[in-house]
Amino acid sequence: MRVYEASISYNLVKLGENLTVNTPAKTVEYLESAFAVHPMQEAFWVILLDRKNRALGRVMISLGTLSNTLVHPREVFKPAFLASASAVIVAHNHPSGDPAPSAADIQVTRQLREAAKILDIILIDHVIVGHAESDPLGVGYYSFRATGLL
């Protein structure tokens, strides 16, 4: 039988004051450089937050294809436990530029909301990042919290 030890490591991505991530715009700003690494693939990220919504870190959960990525609640919340985060914001990009949620995006958000309740971790928002020029509203992102779906 093999027994493994779980751990978490940190790589400095930004030096300065603790960034409070409490709006969709700040979420997009915090993850901008992360999404730039793979602009033609969907990437799903979780931002780990303390009790004052200060970022403890960010973790890429999944890197997919041009049009989808696989996400499971277990993988989303594992880093939150390891970092002792009290809340999370999840986000993914739409390489097409249109941030409108798909049926799969809505379903995943519902699953994450239910898992968060059970695990007693606050799911603050799920933000889909696109491009302002492809967004009918012109903002370039979609927030499940702002639209009342979370």
Language-model features, listed with the residues they occupy:
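Active-site-proximal loop/helix of nucleotide/amide-processing enzymes and allied scaffolds
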Residues: 1-12, 17, 50-52, 62, ...
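Extended substrate/RNA-proximal surfaces in nucleic-acid metabolism proteins
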Residues: 22
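Mobile, glycine- and charge-enriched loop segments
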Residues: 5, 19, 27-70
